[in-house]
């Protein structure tokens, strides 16, 4: 019995001291925390949070504008999310991908939450920001890091779809794309403009090149990136 009590005491001592819910989420994000029944009980008692519950993650990709958008757009976005989607929304920095993550319990129908985000937040933010957004539902905070990586791998879809559309996983995997033919004629026009040293023509031709991928057909973002690399 004495040995059992010592073992239980040890287990309690091994539990991390978590002062905020943000610390809990960061712990799972960076791999510092692992699921255990003891941790689950501790978190439920301290934060009234279910580690094994269903959660929504919104990824806000800021890219090269990270520093500026982090200060300017993210505070307003956080307030909007708490007002219209979930008061339990927490924010994490995802520096390796120049992004921020918003995480909250999935309370209610996911389809309703997505629609609300699209109508009340995305349209407003996109008018004044260059951020693009991804959305994923996951079960268990131990899946937080993997879910962020999954969204990261999908964000190239913003290239053909634009920032006004949320990249919703796994729906995004169901999109059908059209074959992409490289615009050789536009490339030849660009070569001519370079030879003529005509900056106006250069700008016009590059705009034509950009417009080529937005003429109604949906192309694989990887193919578009390959075309840009070839063109440049």
Language-model features, listed with the residues they occupy:
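Extended Gly/Ser/Thr-rich low-complexity repeat segments
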Residues: 111-119, 123-126
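Interdomain helical linkers/hinges and coiled-coil/dimerization scaffolds
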Residues: 1-113, 135-159, 163-197, 207-211, ...
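Conserved short beta-strand edge segments in small beta-sheet-based binding/regulatory domains
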Residues: 123-139
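Helix-capping and short linker residues that terminate individual alpha-solenoid repeat units
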Residues: 214-215
């Amino acid at each position: 019995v004495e040995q059992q009590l010592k073992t239980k005491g040890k287990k309690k001592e091994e539990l991390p001291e978590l002062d905020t819910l943000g610390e809990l989420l960061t712990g799972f994000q960076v791999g510092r925390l692992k699921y255990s029944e003891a941790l689950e009980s501790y978190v439920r008692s301290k934060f009234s949070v279910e580690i094994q519950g269903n959660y929504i993650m919104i990824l806000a990709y800021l890219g090269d504008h990270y520093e500026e958008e982090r200060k300017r757009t993210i505070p307003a976005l956080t307030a909007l999310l708490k007002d219209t989607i979930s008061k339990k929304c927490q924010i994490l920095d995802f520096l390796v991908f120049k992004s921020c993550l918003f995480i909250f319990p999935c309370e209610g129908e996911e389809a309703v939450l997505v629609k609300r985000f699209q109508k009340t937040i995305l349209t407003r933010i996109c008018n004044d920001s260059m951020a693009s957004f991804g959305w994923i539902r996951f079960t268990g905070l131990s899946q937080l890091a993997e879910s962020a990586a999954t969204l990261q791998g999908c964000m190239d879809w913003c290239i053909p779809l634009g920032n006004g559309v949320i990249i919703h996983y796994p729906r995004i995997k169901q999109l059908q794309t059209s074959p992409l033919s490289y615009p050789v004629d536009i490339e030849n026009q660009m070569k001519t403009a370079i030879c003529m040293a005509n900056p106006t023509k250069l700008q016009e031709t590059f705009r034509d090149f950009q417009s080529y991928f937005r003429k109604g057909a949906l192309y694989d973002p990887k193919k578009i990136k390959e075309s840009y690399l070839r063109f440049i």
